[in-house]
Amino acid sequence: MNKKTLVISIDALISDDIPFMETLPNLGPIVKGAAQVRDIECIYPTLTYPCHVSIMTGCYPDKHQIVHNEHLQVNVPKPQWNWWYRDIQVKTMLDYAQAADLSTATVTWPVMAGAPADYNIAEIWAPTIQDDPTEICTQANSPAVKEIFERNKHRLKWMLTPEFDNYAEHCGAQIIEMF
């Protein structure tokens, strides 16, 4: 049997939340049996995208160059998000895993659009809630998950939660089942 490593990040989770998580019917058994990193010292700036890239690289933002969730675009009312893997300036766990001939998957992990994961459902959305996400998601996701995306894109409601989380949950489960 192949060994597998699963990295789960729950945005804004703090160590004080873990006892409650252990009581949950689905997440509880996973949390109880998992290796955990508790009481970490956050990077600065403590924003979702820089934090998640630091987890993937082991580097601070001054090295990996993802310093904010969005690009700095002066006088732009809605700046572009830092979605694209190509903007990370150092190697990530994906690069090291591929060099070791391991298969990889990511499901809505920040800054993974266009990532070299074998199975990648990127955290990305269309410009507005009215826009069809198919084109941008097709560019951002790995080709191997095209069918999974098509089956689940009706769950994707722009960047809204809980719909976005529901989309990620279904895509992740199907990646595990299929591959």
Predicted regions and their residues:
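Glycine-/proline-rich flexible loop or hinge segments
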Residues: 10-12, 37-38, 48-51, 70-82
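Beta-strand elements within well-structured catalytic alpha/beta cores of enzymes
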Residues: 2-16, 29-30, 55, 97, ...
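N-terminal secretory/membrane-targeting segments
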Residues: 1-3, 20, 162-168
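Loop/turn elements at helix/coil->beta-strand transitions in domains of secreted/extracellular proteins
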Residues: 1-5, 34, 100-104
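Short N-terminal binding/cap micro-motifs at the start of the first secondary-structure element
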Residues: 14-19, 115
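His/Asp/Glu-rich, glycine-adjacent segments
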Residues: 59-179
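Short, structured active-site-proximal loop/turn typified by the sulfatase FGly-forming signature C/S-X-P-X-R
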Residues: 18-54, 58-62, 105
